[in-house]
From Swiss-Prot:
Pfam families membership: CobD_Cbib
Protein's cellular compartments: Cell membrane
Bilayer topology: Multi-pass membrane protein
Organism of this sequence: Listeria innocua serovar 6a (strain ATCC BAA-680 / CLIP 11262)
Protein name: Cobalamin biosynthesis protein CobD
Record-level GO cellular component terms: plasma membrane
Family: Belongs to the CobD/CbiB family.
Domain of life, source organism: Bacteria
Transmembrane segment boundaries: 54-74, 78-98, 152-172, 203-223, 295-315
Any GO MF annotation of the entry: threonine-phosphate decarboxylase activity
Predominant subcellular localization, coarse grouping: membrane
BP GO annotations: cobalamin biosynthetic process
């Protein structure tokens, strides 16, 4: 029965994405993180913020697991149909495939209209770097990098944990990922309180990131992109990122499309020097955004089919 629930969750994400007006657990988790972070900052200062960051991680992930388990448990006690609906909905909310594609297409359309200022604002909604001075090509690159990275932590990783431990484990993973996106920065403000969250996010994404590289390589062959180079660049440039995971999917996409990603960016006014990923020399345009979206969908479907096949064999 769980296989049917997983399938419906995946199809719902494929069709609907994440409508902004719908209630969403990740929004609740984000609000909880913000409130708890503010409270902990009033109590802890200096180096003790490292300890506070540990509390932040344990309380956020722990509460996410407990609350989601209780919701499923109570719904099961009331009626099976309610349990099924809650299971499917919670699983669906952990996936970000179509939402990610929609955001990328918005930026693509704005660039096509020649509205650079609006495109800078839009890309600033999905990346952590400063975007107010980006060129059209830099905006395209930032969009592609985000889609590539989030193919791993927005789709493949939630699917991975969903098939292992159902919506509870998938939501706990999303809590880890949300913590990293909110406090896992290396600047002065977040270095201490976000240290534990950043390290745990690296750990949680260790396997999914490498699986994402593999699925993106397969997708590259299916779409008749450069699959061999996707394989090679993903391995060659796997360490060309401050994260131990991000270069795997970004390298696969860069190799598949024959482009170069990464490099130096500004974050909160500070210049962060990063190595490049890929060795392509062609200019990056809106066309490559479309190709990256195709890779996102194809790799996600491949991952789902492989995970569901393994689940059927084992269970």
């Amino acid at each position: 029965m769980s296989v049917l629930f997983y399938t419906i969750s995946f199809i719902l994400d494929f069709i609907l994405g994440d409508p902004y007006s719908w209630p969403h657990p990740i929004k609740v988790i984000g609000n909880f993180i913000q409130l708890l972070t503010n409270a902990l900052r009033k109590i802890f200062h200096g180096k003790s913020l490292y300890f506070a960051g540990g509390l932040l991680f344990i309380l956020t992930v722990g509460m996410t697991g407990i609350v989601s388990w209780l919701i499923l448990y109570i719904s099961a006690k009331i009626a099976f149909w309610l349990y099924a609906a809650v299971f499917i909905y919670l699983g669906y909310t952990t996936l970000a495939m179509t939402c990610l594609a929609k955001e990328a297409r918005k930026i693509q359309r704005t660039l096509a209209d020649g509205d650079l200022e609006a495109a800078r604002v839009q890309v600033g909604m999905i990346v952590g770097r400063d975007t107010d001075k980006l060129t059209a090509e830099q905006i395209s690159k930032a969009t592609i990098e985000t889609v590539a990275e989030n193919t791993a932590d927005g789709v493949i990783a939630p699917l991975f944990y969903l098939f292992i431990g159902g919506p509870v484990l998938a939501l706990m993973y999303k809590a880890v990922n949300t913590l990293d996106s909110m406090v896992g920065y290396k600047n002065e403000k977040y270095r201490a309180i976000g240290f534990v969250s950043a390290k745990m996010d690296d750990l949680a994404n260790f396997i999914p990131a490498r699986l994402s590289w593999f699925f993106l390589v397969i997708a590259s062959f299916i779409l008749k992109y450069d699959g061999r180079t996707a394989w090679r660049i993903g391995l060659r440039d796997r360490k060309n990122h401050t994260s131990p995971n991000c270069a795997y999917p970004e390298g696969a996409v860069a190799g598949a499309l024959g482009i170069t990603l990464g490099g130096t960016h500004e974050y909160f006014g500070e210049t962060v020097v990063k190595p490049t990923i890929g060795s392509g020399t062609k200019a990056v345009t809106q066309k490559e955004i479309s190709q990256t979206i195709h890779l996102l969908y194809t790799a996600s479907i491949i991952a789902f089919l492989i995970f569901i096949s393994i689940h059927l064999i084992l269970f």
